[in-house]
């Protein structure tokens, strides 16, 4: 019976592509056409555009004023530390909030896991505090 079913199937252009196959073919043609347009516009701008290379063209534009210093001033380290601490504790809040939503489903195992997580972060915070990572003032010598 299986051999009869296989032998009676017709193979035509519609049988090669399922409806999803036609959608993917249309998407592939769209992406290819978009890439061709982008590349052709970039090449046209490259070959047809006006080029003038002067030292003045290489300077950054600051509202018509000549640049006076470096483009990227350095920021004090405490700002970076604050950003890193924010990310660490923001992730901690996300874990604790997700635990709080499902605490009744997690049982004692979930409580033990979140307690271990909080204790680990508290130990890390105490370590950073002892090392002086949280001190913003002048360094003691």
Swiss-Prot record:
Belongs to the complex I subunit 3 family. Its main location: membrane. PANTHER family: NADH-QUINONE OXIDOREDUCTASE SUBUNIT A, NADH-UBIQUINONE OXIDOREDUCTASE CHAIN 3. Pfam families: Oxidored_q4. This is NADH-quinone oxidoreductase subunit A. Keywords: Cell inner membrane, Cell membrane, Membrane, NAD, Quinone, Translocase, Transmembrane, Transmembrane helix, Transport, Ubiquinone. It comes from Syntrophotalea carbinolica (strain DSM 2380 / NBRC 103641 / GraBd1) (Pelobacter carbinolicus). Its EC number is 7.1.1.-. NDH-1 is composed of 14 different subunits. Subunits NuoA, H, J, K, L, M, N constitute the membrane sector of the complex. It is found in: Cell inner membrane. NDH-1 shuttles electrons from NADH, via FMN and iron-sulfur (Fe-S) centers, to quinones in the respiratory chain. The immediate electron acceptor for the enzyme in this species is believed to be ubiquinone. Couples the redox reaction to proton translocation (for every two electrons transferred, four hydrogen ions are translocated across the cytoplasmic membrane), and thus conserves the redox energy in a proton gradient. InterPro entries: NAD(P)H_OxRDtase_bac/plastid, NADH_UbQ/plastoQ_OxRdtase_su3, NDAH_ubi_oxred_su3_sf. One of its GO terms (molecular function) is NADH dehydrogenase (ubiquinone) activity. It is an enzyme of class 7 (translocase). It catalyses: a quinone + NADH + 5 H(+)(in) = a quinol + NAD(+) + 4 H(+)(out). The chain crosses the membrane at residues 24-44, 77-97, 106-126. GO terms for cellular component: NADH dehydrogenase complex; plasma membrane. Disulfide bonds: none annotated. It is a multi-pass membrane protein.
